[in-house]
From Swiss-Prot:
Family stated for the protein in its record: Belongs to the class I-like SAM-binding methyltransferase superfamily. Cx-SAM synthase family.
Gene responsible for this protein: cmoA
Binding-site positions, S-adenosyl-L-methionine: Y46, G71, C72, S73, D96, N97, D124, V125, N139, R206
Name of the protein: Carboxy-S-adenosyl-L-methionine synthase
Any Pfam family matching the protein: Methyltransf_25
Annotated keywords: S-adenosyl-L-methionine, Transferase
Positions of transmembrane segments: none
Function, in words: Catalyzes the conversion of S-adenosyl-L-methionine (SAM) to carboxy-S-adenosyl-L-methionine (Cx-SAM).
Length: 249
């Protein structure tokens, strides 16, 4: 069953016309309206990642613990977790700091018949306290959090995760080797062009994300996870400069 990214009839044309000055990217009403199309055409393998988050939830959800979708956007990961854990009783908490995202997520969760399983919260995941959990998802979220706040967030998540519980961390990454970084970036741009984005759209979106999305190397993520107390760290998905890690507590 495909629970993946919520589909949308609205195509992302935000950067299709030339802007004299490109503003900083934000998850506002304009982005929310086209987000399903934007994420599908911009992130290689995004629907697969969402579906496999559901599969991982079915395997790792433990009794009397909650499941977190942190930086939930429209709640696709939370919906996948809810769908494949059935009525286990695990509370699922989905958090985002964008009011526009939360409001639309409420509508989509109702349409998916999962509103009763998922509690939506508007808030900053870098500042919130966590209850005992067996699974947390940071699906392309950490990259938007200030670098100086990332260590503490991952430590607090690890502390809240029960033994055998997991963190799914999906991120756009950079490479220490300049040549590899350039190649992987160009391959990602080729992916976007193949999905209908123009060079103008790719360039303006990249400018908008400058100093908003701050990628790190895979090694930096693995080091942070180990220091926080995760016992096993596995790369379970990778395409170009996008990866998803499975960290086991």
């Amino acid at each position: 069953m495909h629970t993946g990214a919520f589909m949308s009839d609205q195509q992302d044309r935000i950067y299709a016309t030339s802007h004299s000055q490109v503003g900083r990217f934000s998850f506002d009403d304009t982005v929310v309206r086209v987000f399903p199309d934007m994420i599908r055409r911009s992130v290689p393998g995004y629907p697969t990642i969402i579906d496999m988050i559901g599969v991982l939830a079915a395997r790792y959800a433990q009794p009397d613990t909650c499941l977190y979708d942190l930086g939930c956007s429209l709640g696709a990961a939370a919906t996948a977790m809810a769908t494949l854990t059935g009525d286990t009783g695990n509370p699922i908490v989905a958090v985002d700091n964008s009011r526009a995202m939360i409001e639309q997520a409420e509508n989509l969760l109702s349409q998916a018949g999962q509103a009763h399983r998922v509690t939506l919260q508007e808030g900053d995941v870098a500042e919130m306290a966590f209850n005992s959990c067996s699974m947390a998802v940071l699906n392309f979220t950490l990259q938007f959090i200030a670098l100086e706040k990332r260590d503490a967030l991952i430590r607090r998540l690890a502390d809240a995760t029960v033994p055998g519980g997991i963190l799914v961390l999906s991120e756009k990454i950079r490479f220490a080797n300049d040549a590899e970084n350039a190649l992987q970036t160009e391959l990602h741009h080729a992916f976007k062009r193949n999905n209908g984005y123009s060079d103008l759209e790719i360039s303006q979106k990249r400018n908008a994300l400058e100093n908003v999305l701050i990628p790190e190397t895979l090694a930096a993520h693995e080091t942070r996870l180990k220091k926080a107390g995760y016992r096993q760290i596995h790369v379970w998905f990778r395409c170009f400069n996008f990866v998803s890690l499975l960290a086991v507590r």
